[in-house]
């Protein structure tokens, strides 16, 4: 809702051209809902905007300019099923022990490399332990097979787009000139590659200038996020992206949205007490105007089974109350 209203404000109040807006969220469903809301607010002009996921935005960039790397613009995109099938072949041909190196574990390792913008050559150079060397070798084999198939996997989409913008300043400047307003949702869930993409489009200190062309002023960047809600570290998300935002983008202004519209004050007071123990966070106190609500009940379970049974019983009781 915050991003949607911001976009509507840009177009209707500041007369921003819709085609200069890039809005990024994390799921196709969220992107579709955002597009619908913006169209409702500002009309069909909103269709000129790029409102998409990181992956979809990168696909559009790559379809235009990936041939700079000698890759066909009609490249295929491997989804998770395709990628797993290919990695299974890699693991089989490298005779990896499936118990020690399950296919999914190898895929996760390769995904982590790509999310950190580490190519297979660097992965091999930096591999210090036997498992790291195994993952680096699998990465190299996997990547060579992708190239032979004229394909990119999901992680390649973002990594390759970042490398493209870094390697060819004229391509980067083209998109910096087009997207004068960049908005990113759930910024606390971004990984290093996604962070790097945002910097290439918006930062004022990017390397490389197109000869004979003045450096484009950084785009106006707005991100929405909450460091207290960062839960995707296991997928490569780094909380430092939002914690260091003001240092990464000097002059940024932080607006704290501390009113909660879903929970009662008793719940929020407990949440405030728990989260206050986190280190290095911006202090905020969530509040609500929907009342104190019922007191929180604590229950100690003896086992995971007891815990699950308690939850099931509570849900069953609530359902009975609703139907009564």
Task: Identify the residue ranges that each predicted region occupies.
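Conserved nucleotide-binding/hydrolysis micro-motifs of P-loop NTPases
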Residues: 28-31, 55-58, 112, 227-231, ...
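Proline-centered turn/helix-capping motifs that create local helix->coil transitions or kinks
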Residues: 114-120, 206-210, 274-286
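Short glycine-/polar-rich loops that comprise or flank the Walker A/P-loop
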Residues: 16-20, 45-48, 83-86, 217-220, ...
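P-loop NTPase Walker
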Residues: 1-73, 77-78, 149, 173, ...
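Alpha-helical scaffold elements adjacent to nucleotide-binding pockets in ATP/GTP-utilizing enzyme cores
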Residues: 6, 33-41, 57-64, 86-89, ...
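ATP-hydrolysis module of ASCE/P-loop NTPase motor domains
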Residues: 46-49, 67-156, 179, 254-261, ...
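Conserved helicase NTPase motor core
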Residues: 1-3, 22-23, 30-31, 50, ...
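Helicase P-loop NTPase motor core
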Residues: 1, 7, 66, 250-253, ...
């Amino acid at each position: 809702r915050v991003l949607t209203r911001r976009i509507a404000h840009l177009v209707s109040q500041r007369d921003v051209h819709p085609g200069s807006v890039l809005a990024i969220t994390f799921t196709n469903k969220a992107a579709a809902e955002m597009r619908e809301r913006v169209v409702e607010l500002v009309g069909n002009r909103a269709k000129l905007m790029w409102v998409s996921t990181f992956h979809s935005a990168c696909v559009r960039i790559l379809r235009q300019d990936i041939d700079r790397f000698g890759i066909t613009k009609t490249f295929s995109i491997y989804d998770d099923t395709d990628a797993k099938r290919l990695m299974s072949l890699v693991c089989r041909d490298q005779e990896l022990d499936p118990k020690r190196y399950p296919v999914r574990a190898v895929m996760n390792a390769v995904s982590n490399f790509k999310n950190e913008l580490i190519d297979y050559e660097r992965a091999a150079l930096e591999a210090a332990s036997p498992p790291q060397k195994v993952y680096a070798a699998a990465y190299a084999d996997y990547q060579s097979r992708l190239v032979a198939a004229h394909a990119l996997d999901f992680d390649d989409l973002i990594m390759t787009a970042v490398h493209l913008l870094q390697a060819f300043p004229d391509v980067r400047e083209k998109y910096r000139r087009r997207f004068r307003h960049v908005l990113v949702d759930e910024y606390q869930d971004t990984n290093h590659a996604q962070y790097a993409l945002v910097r290439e489009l918006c930062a004022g200190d990017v390397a490389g200038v197109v000869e004979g062309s003045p450096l484009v002023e950084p785009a106006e960047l707005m991100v929405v996020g909450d460091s207290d809600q960062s839960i995707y570290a296991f997928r490569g998300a780094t909380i430092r992206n939002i914690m260091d935002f003001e240092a990464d983008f000097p002059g940024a202004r932080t607006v704290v949205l501390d009113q909660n519209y879903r929970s009662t004050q008793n719940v929020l007071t407990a949440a405030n007490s728990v989260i206050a123990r986190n280190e290095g966070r911006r202090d905020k106190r969530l509040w609500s105007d929907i009342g104190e609500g019922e007191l929180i009940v604590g229950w100690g379970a003896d086992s995971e089974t007891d815990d699950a049974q308690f939850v099931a019983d509570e849900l069953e009781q609530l359902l009975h109350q609703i139907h009564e």
